[in-house]
Amino acid sequence: MHKKVLLAILDGYGISNKQHGNAVYHAKTPALDSLIKDYPCVMLEASGEAVGLPQGQIGNSEVGHLNIGAGRIVYTGLSLINQNIKTGAFHHNQVLLEAIARAKANNAKLHLIGLFSHGGVHSHMDHLYALIKLAAPQVKMVLHLFGDGRDVAPCTMKSDLEAFMVFLKDYHNVIIGTLGGRYYGMDRDQRWDREEIAYNAILGNSKASFTDPVAYVQSAYDQKVTDEFLYPAVNGNVDKEQFALKDHDSVIFFNFRPDRARQMSHMLFQTDYYDYTPKAGRKYNLFFVTMMNYEGIKPSAVVFPPETIPNTFGEVIAHNKLKQLRIAETEKYAHVTFFFDGGVEVDLPNETKCMVPSLKVATYDLAPEMACKGITDQLLNQINQFDLTVLNFANPDMVGHTGNYAACVQGLEALDVQIQRIIDFCKANHITLFLTADHGNAEEMIDSNNNPVTKHTVNKVPFVCTDTNIDLQQDSASLANIAPTILAYLGLKQPAEMTANSLLISKK
């Protein structure tokens, strides 16, 4: 019988032996529990060197889907940039040097925009420090910094700023122009009202201002506002002409991960990706640079252009003239398409893409079920048409990021109902379910001091197959082993570029 496969990726669903604050453990999820207990299952590495990140670095959705789709370890933004800084190549990068030179030639400013974080998921503070060391001796610099509070603890910006302000004392050419939370400046669900507030601050206009960056963040903490939700504020110590974005300025967006940088990039530098124009208009003749390639954005230049990843999982399916479906809600749609396909936007032969709209709520603890039922409804209507379906459920990650433990438990329990529907449908229709995750999150929601945890983890993730005629090797394995395993299961030849091994063991 011709085999059909569903690969279900539970975003942020890690496994931990620690029970305290573990929403995965405490949620009533009989369907998921049964899959892991009763079927072939192996625990996969989803962080650090096993997925192309520095040792001990937490995994993330972008890297996770890249490795799953590539069938090999993919060295991405963080490791690549770190290595360039270490070798000194960073300081000779021609794109960075051109951004500096253009600002000097135009008697203009160089703006650095990005996430102020050591989380290493979207950006890293070390890269900001390196950029300042490179450019500050040569040109006036303005920093527009977004607080994190998701990929690190909710209130880390103050201590990070304290150290940063000491560093800046040696660089008199550098000022912090604006501060704000990623909730405003790094949305990815077209909530343009939020982006407008952050963008207007970059233009020099906000109802909030600061004279002391550290004190401004502390005042937010006093009002129970964490880094993520810091209201965009402008520097009140200087005239706005000293920090506001102007015509002919240079801009470096130092996030290396694209999904939460695209919308602000569109506000700054017109693209064809979105049908939206900022109310205040755009500045002219910007030299706009992105650290990595941002899907759908065509900047003036890219500091580290993408390296091609040939023969991805999706390409192998297409080359074999098989039909495939990619399905997720808005929040994770790019992950099962762009990232899964090696960091490129591509429409493969016999491929269908389905995006289910994410719910319009301020934070997902307000609707922890998210769009999991809508995704499942769409899935069950279409899946029989396809040989391979790749699905993402966002609940464990997106609700996990809110730090709301009770809501995360609710989200997992709502998700489990849909998982049971999928299991039943797959059994009735002879579809093999492979279930995994891209990284951990929901299994660590409360720390030992009973503080909420909002960031990803370094825990392993499950990889389950519902075909009991096979088994899975229990040796050390990672996300990169998933594609080779499913290709072997489908009887398809693994391409040479896909260097990870299949974990498949046949019992027959």
Curated annotation (Swiss-Prot):
Alphabetical GO biological process terms: glucose catabolic process; glycolytic process; positive regulation of fibrinolysis
The protein's matches in Gene3D superfamilies, at most eight in alphabetical order, are given as: Alkaline Phosphatase, subunit A (3.40.720.10), BPG-independent phosphoglycerate mutase, domain B (3.40.1450.10)
- The answer, when asked if Isomerase is one of the entry's keywords, is yes
Organism, as annotated = Mycoplasma pneumoniae (strain ATCC 29342 / M129 / Subtype 1) (Mycoplasmoides pneumoniae)
The record's GO CC annotations read: cytosol; membrane
> What gene name is given for the protein in this entry?
gpmI
Similarity remark: Belongs to the BPG-independent phosphoglycerate mutase family.
Protein's UniProt name: 2,3-bisphosphoglycerate-independent phosphoglycerate mutase
Q: How does it assemble?
A: Monomer.
Look up keyword Isomerase and say if it applies: yes
Specify which residues bind Mn(2+) 2 according to the UniProt entry for this protein: 11, 61, 438-439
Binding residue positions for Mn(2+) 1: 397, 401, 456
